[in-house]
């Protein structure tokens, strides 16, 4: 593993592992060579170093004879711990005063405040898991839906890493053969069969292309789908949002232009989080405030991953709808066209809009067609590929490394077509191995590790 220790890992770190604030319990975690001695110095009822691993002990925390709290101490002896070091977790009462006093006491006894993500960094540096798995720990902690939880869990257990590792192993074999040729350059010996190498690279590219393509779904599973509801004033946008959310989030009024700014909330559909933005209506504004809302609506449209265009079937003509659809087609984001208020004009729909395909008809007020709309939301983000248990890329860093790997592999193919010397071919293969190694941490730098783990919460 090409990495340098970014912090002194011979010391013992401590941090609050439970959320800040008052709670039933607070959990303080220590990791490092002095974790047992430091704990024993404030927990006199047990010699922590002498107890078996994975055991739990009840007793008092004492500071020079003064009892601070009655606690539960859990002992994990390295390497059978999260960090593969000696680890102690102290569960105390969740008073902010007790937690603060206990942390200060442990610091005085020789522990050091942990940096954000330092426990997980130590686990990575000690070989507990690779870098992609370490990043999945943070994703698991921040997961807020069934889908994001499932993807993070699969990655933390090594599913994604296994795919990358297999690709590297296949390439390493051919790289070694090409490198060996350089030692026999004067004899014109070819150890790496070029036909087999070309076949392998095409196979690897197919896997990488699938992983790159999966990022569009993986990213929205991890971060949610920014979804904008647009349409003319009084088309029923706020009513639709309220119906989807089953609560009154937006002001509903018969007065056109009531929604002057943005109302944001989240809807979970089969584990996928859609971050809905109900916008001001698209029309000529009658005052300065409303004009600002319309302008920002158009800005939100360009930033959205999904657009729901809602129109009133009662007051919209086919010509108007076709004109609006032309504007929607200019957007990069996929969109759904939804006709609202079918309860008021159901019989005339077929005649009026018979030449326009793909319209989803609903009544937001009567809750008609809402389930069909939800299924269309899932279909448009290609949700089926997630349900098939395919590996998904959710991390932008991994996505960029995969793209760079693909570029390097294209260079290898170009080099073989041009019959470049073996040393240049080997260089391009090494470059592809480098970018794959960036994902798992087989190739890493201090700056990269600092950047990744600094985004973790303290105590993890």
UniProtKB/Swiss-Prot annotation:
Cofactor annotation: K(+)
Disulfide linkage: none
Subcellular location: Cytoplasm
GO BP field: tRNA methylation; tRNA wobble uridine modification
Record keywords, A-Z: Cytoplasm, GTP-binding, Hydrolase, Magnesium, Metal-binding, Nucleotide-binding, Potassium, tRNA processing
Binding positions for Mg(2+) per the UniProt entry: 238, 259
Alphabetical list of InterPro entries matching this protein: G_TrmE, GTP-bd, GTP-bd_TrmE_N, GTPase_MnmE, MnmE_dom2, MnmE_helical, P-loop_NTPase, Small_GTP-bd
EC number(s) recorded for this UniProt protein: 3.6.-.-
Protein family per UniProt: Belongs to the TRAFAC class TrmE-Era-EngA-EngB-Septin-like GTPase superfamily. TrmE GTPase family.
Protein name: tRNA modification GTPase MnmE
Organism ancestry: Bacteria, Pseudomonadati, Bacteroidota, Cytophagia, Cytophagales
Gene: mnmE
């Amino acid at each position: 593993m090409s990495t340098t220790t970014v912090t002194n890992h011979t010391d013992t770190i401590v941090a609050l592992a439970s959320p800040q604030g008052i709670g039933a319990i607070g959990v303080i975690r220590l990791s490092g060579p002095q974790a047992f001695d430091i704990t024993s110095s404030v927990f006199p009822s047990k010699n922590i170093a002498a107890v078996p691993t994975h055991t739990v002990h009840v007793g008092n925390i004492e500071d020079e004879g003064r009892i601070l709290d009655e606690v539960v101490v859990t002992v994990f002896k390295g390497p059978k711990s999260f960090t593969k070091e000696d680890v102690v977790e102290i569960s105390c009462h969740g008073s902010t005063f007790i937690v603060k006093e206990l942390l200060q006491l442990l610091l005085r006894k020789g522990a050091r405040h942990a940096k954000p993500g330092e426990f997980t960094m130590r686990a990575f540096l000690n070989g507990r898991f690779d870098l992609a798995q370490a990043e999945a720990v943070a994703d698991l902690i921040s997961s807020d839906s069934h889908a994001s939880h499932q993807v993070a869990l699969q990655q933390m257990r090594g599913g994604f890493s296994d795919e990358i590792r297999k690709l590297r192993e296949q390439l390493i074999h051919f790289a070694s053969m090409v490198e060996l040729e350089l030692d026999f350059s004067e004899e014109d010996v070819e150890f790496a069969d070029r036909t087999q190498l070309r076949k392998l690279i095409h196979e690897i590219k197919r896997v990488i292309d699938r992983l790159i393509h999966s990022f569009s779904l993986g990213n929205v599973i991890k971060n949610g789908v920014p979804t904008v509801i647009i349409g003319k004033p009084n088309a029923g946008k706020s009513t639709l949002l309220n119906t989807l959310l089953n609560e009154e989030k937006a002001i509903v009024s018969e007065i056109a232009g009531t929604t002057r700014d943005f109302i944001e909330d989240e809807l979970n559909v089969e584990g996928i989080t859609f971050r809905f933005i109900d916008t001001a209506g698209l029309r000529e504004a009658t005052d300065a405030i409303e004009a600002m809302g319309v302008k920002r609506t158009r800005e939100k449209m360009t930033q959205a991953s999904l657009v729901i265009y809602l129109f009133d079937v009662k007051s919209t003509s086919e010509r108007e709808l076709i004109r609006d659809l032309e504007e929607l087609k200019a957007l990069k984001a996929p969109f759904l066209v939804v006709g609202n208020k079918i309860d008021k004009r159901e019989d005339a729909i077929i005649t009026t809009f018979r030449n326009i395909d793909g319209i989803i008809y609903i009544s937001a007020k009567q809750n008609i067609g809402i389930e069909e709309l939800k299924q269309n939301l899932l279909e448009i983000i290609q949700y089926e590929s997630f349900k098939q248990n395919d590996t998904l890329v959710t991390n932008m860093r991994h996505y960029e490394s995969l793209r760079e790997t693909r570029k390097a592999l294209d260079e290898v193919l170009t080099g073989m077509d041009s019959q470049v010397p073996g040393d240049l071919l080997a260089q391009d293969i090494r470059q592809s191995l480098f970018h794959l190694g960036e994902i798992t941490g087989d190739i890493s730098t201090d700056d990269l590790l600092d950047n990744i783990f600094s985004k973790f919460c303290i105590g993890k």
